[in-house]
C-alpha cells in the first residue's frame, strides 16, 4: 500500500488522536489512550513512524505488532491511528517487481536510499507513480453506460506476456460520467468517473484492497484441468489441478525449494506469485538471478519468465511480524490476477516459518500455547489461507474464469511429519508430495516418496485424461501396482536373494527399477530433462509398461514348454531394447519436437514387439 499517503505524526495538530507507548516487547508494542481504535487497524509507532497493526484491544489499551525493528522506541512515544486496515495496491507494475512482506518495493527503496538495508519508517508507494502506462478503454463503454464491481473497463499491456485488465473495485457501481481516451497515464491519474445516487467517484488504474479480506467471486467451480509441473513423478502419479492446494513437506536438503522453483519456471500457469517467507536470503537472490535468464516461448517469441512473476521476499532476517503479513500479501495479489481471468500459482516457501512467526507473536502476547508451543488457532489460520485457492467464475463482465493454485512448502524439524504444522496442513490440502530424506541421500531427485504421497484429484481429472490421453489412466494404475509389488518383494529379496524368486517377480523387480531410475528420477539441471511435457511422460510410461506386459506374457506362455523363456534369456537378447528404454528421457522436447519424439517412441514399441516375437519363435 502507499505508506507515503498515511498521516504523519508531525502533521497532526490535535493531540487527542494520539495514543502513547506503554510497553515494548520485541515486535509487540502496547499503547494506552487508544479508545476508538479498530482491530487490524494500521498505526504509526514512535518518532520514526514505524508501521504496525493492532492485534488486540482491551479497554483503551491496544496491542500492536510492528512490521519493523523496534529498537529505540521508548515509553511515552506517540502512536498515531490511521483509520485504515493493512492493504495492498493492485494495478499495473506488479509483474516483475519484488516486494517485502507489507508490499514495499525493494528495488525502489534501494535506489532511493542507496542502502542495502531497508531504513526504518520508509515511505514509498508500492507501485511506481513515475511510469506511464498505455491505457486502452473498453470498446463498448461510453458516457452513460452502467458498470458494476468487477467489470473490465480498460486494458494496459503491462508487458508482452501479461495483458493487465483494469477492473472496477468489487464494491463500486454507477453510470459512467467520464472515461479517459486512449493514451499514456500514470498510476494516480483519473481514468474513470462514476455517478451513483448523485455521488461522483473518481478511479485511477490502482485499487487498494485489505489483505485479510477475501476478494469476492460470482461462484466457485469444480477444478478439472491439471496443473502440469513438468516433473514426471508429479504429473503422472500425483497430479494437482489448476485451483488446487498442495503441500510439499520435507526435511532440510530434500529439494523443496527446487520443486517450487521448477513449478514457477515451467508450470502451465499464466501468473506466478512466489512468496519467500522466512527462508534464506540466498534462495530469494537465486530466484532473482535465475528467473530473468529463463525464457519461455509464446507465439514463437522468446520471453523472460520474470515478466509473469512477482516476488514477495521476506527472508529470515527481516522482522518477524511482517512474515505473517507476507502470506496474506501474496494471496491477495494472486486473487487480483485471478479476477482478470488468469490461472495463478502461488508458491509459499515455507509455511513452517510463517507458523513460527505466529508462535513467536502468540508467545509475546502470553496466549495459552497448544501443541509444541504453537497457538491454538494455528489450524484455523492455515485453513483461512489455503481456502482462498480454487477455480472460480469471476465477478463482472465479460464472463471469465480464473483460478488460484497454492503450493505450500512445509519444513518440519527433523523431517517428522507428525509435527503440528504438517498435520494441520495435511488436513486441509488435497495433494501431498512427501519428500523423503533417504531418497535425497541416494541422490534420487525429485525425492518424492511414491508410497506415502497422494492426490485426491485423480477422479476430477479422469475426464480430462479420457479426452486427451485415453491410455493414460490404466498405465498409471499399473505403474503404481508394480512399485507397490516391488516394495513387498524387497523384504523377501533381503532374506533369500534374487535368484530364488519366481521369473515373473524378477521381471517386476527389474521393471520397477527401470521406472524408478529412468522415469521417476529427473535431473532438473539438464536441458533435456528439466521440463518433461505430458506427451513425453505418457510415451515413456507406455513403453515401460508395454515391456512389462510382453515380458510377463512371454514367461507365462512358455512356462510349461521345453524351451521356456526366463528373465535372464530376455535380458541377454534385449540388451539394446533395455538400453533404449532407459535412455528415452534423453529426448529433448525443445530440439526434437513433439512429432519426432512420438515417432521415436512408437518405433521403439515396434522394435520391442518384433524382438519378443523372434524370441518366442
Swiss-Prot record:
The keyword Membrane applies. It comes from the Eukaryota. GO terms for cellular component: apical plasma membrane; ATPase complex; clathrin-coated vesicle membrane; cytoplasm; cytosol; extrinsic component of synaptic vesicle membrane; lysosome; microvillus. It is an enzyme of class 7 (translocase). ATP hydrolysis occurs at the interface between the nucleotide-binding domains of subunits A and B. ATP hydrolysis triggers a conformational change in the subunits D and F, which induces a shift of subunit d. The c-ring is subsequently rotated and results in a continuous proton translocation across the membrane. Disulfide bonds: none annotated. InterPro entries: ATP-synt_VA_C, ATP-synth_a_Xtn, ATP_synth_asu-like_sf, ATPase_a/bsu_AS, ATPase_F1/V1/A1_a/bsu_N, ATPase_F1/V1/A1_a/bsu_N_sf, ATPase_F1/V1/A1_a/bsu_nucl-bd, ATPase_F1/V1_b/a_C. The modification Phosphoserine is found at residue 384. Keywords: ATP-binding, Cytoplasm, Cytoplasmic vesicle, Hydrogen ion transport, Ion transport, Lysosome, Membrane, Nucleotide-binding, Phosphoprotein, Translocase, Transport. One of its GO terms (molecular function) is ATP binding. Catalytic subunit of the V1 complex of vacuolar(H+)-ATPase (V-ATPase), a multisubunit enzyme composed of a peripheral complex (V1) that hydrolyzes ATP and a membrane integral complex (V0) that translocates protons. V-ATPase is responsible for acidifying and maintaining the pH of intracellular compartments and in some cell types, is targeted to the plasma membrane, where it is responsible for acidifying the extracellular environment. Belongs to the ATPase alpha/beta chains family. This is V-type proton ATPase catalytic subunit A. It comes from Mus musculus. The gene is Atp6v1a.
Amino acid at each position: 500500500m502507499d505508506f507515503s499517503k498515511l498521516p504523519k505524526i508531525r502533521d497532526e495538530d490535535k493531540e487527542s488522536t494520539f495514543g502513547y507507548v506503554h510497553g515494548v516487547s520485541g515486535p509487540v508494542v502496547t499503547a494506552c489512550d487508544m479508545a476508538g481504535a479498530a482491530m487490524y487497524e494500521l498505526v504509526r509507532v514512535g518518532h520514526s513512524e514505524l508501521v504496525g497493526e493492532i492485534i488486540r484491544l482491551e479497554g483503551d489499551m491496544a496491542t500492536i505488532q510492528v512490521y519493523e525493528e523496534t529498537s529505540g522506541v521508548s515509553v511515552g512515544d506517540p502512536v498515531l491511528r490511521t483509520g485504515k486496515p493493512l492493504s495492498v495496491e493492485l494495478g499495473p507494475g506488479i509483474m516483475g517487481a519484488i516486494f517485502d512482506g507489507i508490499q514495499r518495493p525493494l528495488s525502489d527503496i534501494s535506489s532511493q536510499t542507496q542502502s542495502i538495508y531497508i531504513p526504518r519508517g520508509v515511505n514509498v508507494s508500492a507501485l511506481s507513480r513515475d511510469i506511464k502506462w498505455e491505457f486502452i478503454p473498453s470498446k463498448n463503454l461510453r458516457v452513460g453506460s452502467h458498470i458494476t464491481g468487477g467489470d473490465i473497463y480498460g486494458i494496459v499491456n503491462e508487458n508482452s506476456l501479461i495483458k493487465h485488465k483494469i477492473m472496477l473495485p468489487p464494491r463500486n457501481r454507477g453510470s459512467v460520467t467520464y472515461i479517459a481516451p486512449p493514451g499514456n497515464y500514470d498510476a494516480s491519474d483519473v481514468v474513470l468517473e462514476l455517478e451513483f445516487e448523485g455521488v461522483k467517484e473518481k478511479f485511477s488504474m490502482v485499487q487498494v484492497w485489505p489483505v485479510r479480506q477475501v476478494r469476492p467471486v460470482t461462484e466457485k467451480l469444480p477444478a478439472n484441468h491439471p496443473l502440469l509441473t513438468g516433473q514426471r513423478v508429479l504429473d503422472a502419479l500425483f497430479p494437482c489441478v489448476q485451483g488446487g492446494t498442495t503441500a510439499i513437506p520435507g526435511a532440510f536438503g530434500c529439494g523443496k525449494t527446487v520443486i517450487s522453483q521448477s513449478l514457477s519456471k515451467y508450470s502451465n500457469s499464466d501468473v506466478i506469485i512466489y512468496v519467500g517467507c522466512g527462508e534464506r536470503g540466498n534462495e530469494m537472490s537465486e530466484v532473482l538471478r535465475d528467473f530473468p535468464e529463463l525464457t519461455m516461448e509464446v507465439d514463437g517469441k522468446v520471453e523472460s519468465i520474470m515478466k509473469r512473476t512477482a516476488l514477495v521476499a521476506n527472508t529470515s532476517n527481516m522482522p518477524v511480524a511482517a512474515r505473517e503479513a507476507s502470506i496474506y500479501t501474496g494471496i491477495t495479489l494472486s486473487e487480483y490476477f485471478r479476477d482478470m481471468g488468469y490461472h495463478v500459482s502461488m508458491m509459499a516457501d515455507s509455511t513452517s516459518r510463517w507458523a513460527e512467526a505466529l508462535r513467536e507473536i502468540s508467545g509475546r502476547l502470553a496466549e495459552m500455547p497448544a501443541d509444541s508451543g504453537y497457538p491454538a488457532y494455528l489450524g484455523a489460520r492455515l485453513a483461512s489461507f489455503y481456502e482462498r485457492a480454487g477455480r472460480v467464475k469471476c465477478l463482472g463482465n465479460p464472463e471469465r474464469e480464473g483460478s488460484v493454485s497454492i503450493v505450500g512448502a512445509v519444513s518440519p524439524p527433523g523431517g517428522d511429519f507428525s509435527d503440528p504444522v504438517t498435520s494441520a496442513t495435511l488436513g486441509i490440502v488435497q495433494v501431498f508430495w512427501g519428500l523423503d530424506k533417504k531418497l535425497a541421500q541416494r541422490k534420487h531427485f525429485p525425492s518424492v516418496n511414491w508410497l506415502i504421497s497422494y492426490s485426491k484429484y485423480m477422479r476430477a481429472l479422469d475426464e480430462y485424461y479420457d479426452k486427451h490421453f485415453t491410455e493414460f489412466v490404466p498405465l498409471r494404475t499399473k505403474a503404481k501396482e508394480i512399485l507397490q509389488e516391488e516394495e513387498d518383494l524387497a523384504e523377501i529379496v533381503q532374506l533369500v536373494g534374487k535368484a530364488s524368486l519366481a521369473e515373473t517377480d524378477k521381471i517386476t523387480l527389474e521393471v520397477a527399477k527401470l521406472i524408478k531410475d529412468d522415469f521417476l528420477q529427473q535431473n532438473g539441471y539438464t536441458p533435456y530433462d528439466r521440463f518433461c511435457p505430458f506427451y513425453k511422460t505418457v510415451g515413456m510410461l507406455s513403453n515401460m509398461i508395454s515391456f512389462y506386459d510382453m515380458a510377463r506374457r512371454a514367461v507365462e506362455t512358455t512356462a510349461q514348454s521345453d524351451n521356456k523363456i526366463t528373465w535372464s534369456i530376455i535380458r541377454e537378447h534385449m540388451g539394446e531394447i533395455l538400453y533404449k528404454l532407459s535412455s528415452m528421457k534423453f529426448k529433448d522436447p525443445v530440439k526434437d519436437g513433439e512429432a519426432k519424439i512420438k515417432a521415436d517412441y512408437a518405433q521403439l514399441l515396434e522394435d520391442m514387439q518384433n524382438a519378443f516375437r523372434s524370441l518366442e519363435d
